[in-house]
Amino acid sequence: MGKRDRADRDKKKSRKRHYEDEEDDEEDAPGNDPQEAVPSAAGKQVDESGTKVDEYGAKDYRLQMPLKDDHTSRPLWVAPDGHIFLEAFSPVYKYAQDFLVAIAEPVCRPTHVHEYKLTAYSLYAAVSVGLQTSDITEYLRKLSKTGVPDGIMQFIKLCTVSYGKVKLVLKHNRYFVESCHPDVIQHLLQDPVIRECRLRNSEGEATELITETFTSKSAISKTAESSGGPSTSRVTDPQGKSDIPMDLFDFYEQMDKDEEEEEETQTVSFEVKQEMIEELQKRCIHLEYPLLAEYDFRNDSVNPDINIDLKPTAVLRPYQEKSLRKMFGNGRARSGVIVLPCGAGKSLVGVTAACTVRKRCLVLGNSAVSVEQWKAQFKMWSTIDDSQICRFTSDAKDKPIGCSVAISTYSMLGHTTKRSWEAERVMEWLKTQEWGLMILDEVHTIPAKMFRRVLTIVQAHCKLGLTATLVREDDKIVDLNFLIGPKLYEANWMELQNNGYIAKVQCAEVWCPMSPEFYREYVAIKTKKRILLYTMNPNKFRACQFLIKFHERRNDKIIVFADNVFALKEYAIRLNKPYIYGPTSQGERMQILQNFKHNPKINTIFISKVGDTSFDLPEANVLIQISSHGGSRRQEAQRLGRVLRAKKGMVAEEYNAFFYSLVSQDTQEMAYSTKRQRFLVDQGYSFKVITKLAGMEEEDLAFSTKEEQQQLLQKVLAATDLDAEEEVVAGEFGSRSSQASRRFGTMSSMSGADDTVYMEYHSSRSKAPSKHVHPLFKRFRK
């Protein structure tokens, strides 16, 4: 019996990923196993057996990685565990980086040495943009300072041998299974299920195999600026050519030619039944030949072209152009994800993609504010008429007659309860349309099951995901690879900053000592009120007030972020500054934001977590964070993005934007702060620790006396546990707000004077260890 219990527990642990998702409250629908949509090779890892580890945990690769004679001229170290290290000071860094971004996931990219990791998904992405198995292995051998380990070669072959060899192409509204490898087509046709999916003529005979030769050329033309190589990469030193081995030099020249030349490709294809597409995809995955979806939009004569083009004023930056060339590399549209920093112009990439495809386009954002901003971006960068844009939110439901671009939110499409009559009509219209392109903004925020629902409601030939932070605190991010497509491009934040495309930001963590009275209560209290105590720390308030005064004297525009509404109101009201949070009406929000943008007297605004992703404030150049959402790396990066937009007319200084995170010393907040910074540190940012703000004693600041601090403490202690809760943003997925909380009250409250009831808790009973707890509920016991 004990063995069976142990086996059950092991099985539950292996499935834990599908249950424990912090950002998804929905129950698993029967038959929706995510593993059905993932080839078995995707779960493979690089074999590390045989690697020696010293007493400090460092790996000793000296025997496995003998150096080449000309190793100083080659930029890569390829470790047996799949990690690749790139010397950013190498004269051939430009080419090596472009290659690594295509085949591996960036792990950490500081100034001098960058770290990447080979994964099954990154290799799938490499194959999807046209790289062959032999290309990847040959390039790695040429670039590596040492011999490439056999385990790495086997891993690359395992992950790329079958992926990308078969494509599902839509031409003239007919579906074809296409491949450059005739033997693969013959292998698939031997399977009875695939033979059943093949289209038959009126006599019941299978249609003939179609052999075609076509010339593939990118749908995005190369500009003069980017034709000499991406400006976001370092230029090769002409003096350094003599240091480059001849095989590398010849190879780089060939790479440049291959990118510029048109390529002739011979393909073999057969037509399949449209109603059996889903069954065909599942069967191909089972046979380890997952179908890569491509949309031949130029030859789609069934769906009408829409009247949309880029305005002459819309000039693409080199990295934007490069990301789109990955999407439209062979004259067709590939589905996938493009990762660009906040403020680097993701919207222009989306608008350009819509102008290239020129078919009906559906844009999905995560809030009503982002819907309005997408509409403004389409009008700013493209020639589309206002009447052709249709919004579908709870507040704005434009009539879809003659609509070419529809903009909505994930929650509107994924809504399962009863809708109004008007909303039902718009939903019916959305379902019946055949969309050429679907743009998914902030694609990392929505869990896999929500995507499945949205993707089954509307049909689109091509899906483009846009995000700045391809990270989640759970491991659901990998599901995007097969729900949308592989990662097509990821920009290097530091290079964009050095080239002036995004602001140069000074990141600082300001340590604020806890006042003795506040710290005494912090140690004694075990409830959520501890959060209020370290957020309302008087020394943190004084530091915030000092930084606001300092930057206002420089005529800077300042945003102060607070996840806690109690703290947000206290800070803003005491400092006499406007604030925006969930219940603030749309009209008041727009009024505050317009004043912040154009009124020289309004230089500081306070915003709750509603401003993390939806507010576009290019004027802001200082951000102060007084409270945050635990250790969320994503939120830290999104907030930094509020001040990342390139600054116009700023004084030429080393830094032109500032990001301050105020942290109460010796509290849980310090551990959270370290976790939050991991993503930005991996992008190459460094956080300066400030323990004392120079000139703070000379300023006239609030809470300078013990009496004032004591009054503030009493106010915090009188607050309820509900006040310590973070704000729950309407329409936010996975928000779990507790329906009840334990709090102190007066005797009149307990007798029903303010609609509360008296309850008792048995602490010993709640602390009793529970047996055989299902993994789904374990996190509630933490």
Curated annotation (Swiss-Prot):
Pfam families: ERCC3_RAD25_C, Helicase_C_3, ResIII. InterPro entries: ATP-dep_DNA_Helicase, ERCC3_RAD25_C, Helicase/UvrB_N, Helicase_ATP-bd, Helicase_C-like, P-loop_NTPase, XPB/Ssl2, XPB/Ssl2_N. One of its GO terms (biological process) is transcription-coupled nucleotide-excision repair. The keyword Protein biosynthesis does not apply. Phosphorylation on Ser-751 by CK2 controls the 5'-excision activity of ERCC1-XPF endonuclease; phosphorylated protein inhibits the excision activity and thus NER. Dephosphorylation reactivates the 5'-excision step. Phosphorylation has no effect on transcription or the 3'-5' helicase activity. Phosphorylation on Ser-751 by CK2 controls the 5'-excision activity of ERCC1-XPF endonuclease; phosphorylated protein inhibits the excision activity and thus NER. ATPase activity is stimulated by TFIIH subunit p52 (GTF2H4). DNA translocase activity by this subunit in TFIIH is stimulated by XPA, ERCC5/XPG and XFP plus ERCC1; translocase activity is sensitive to triptolide which targets this enzyme. Residues 218-236 have a biased composition (Polar residues). Residues 1-51, 218-241 are annotated as: Disordered. Gene3D superfamilies: P-loop containing nucleotide triphosphate hydrolases. Keywords: ATP-binding, Cockayne syndrome, Deafness, Disease variant, DNA damage, DNA repair, DNA-binding, Dwarfism, Helicase, Host-virus interaction, Hydrolase, Ichthyosis, Isomerase, Nucleotide-binding, Nucleus, Phosphoprotein, Transcription, Transcription regulation, Xeroderma pigmentosum. Belongs to the helicase family. RAD25/XPB subfamily. This is General transcription and DNA repair factor IIH helicase/translocase subunit XPB. It comes from Homo sapiens (Human). The lineage of its organism: Eukaryota, Metazoa, Chordata, Craniata, Vertebrata.
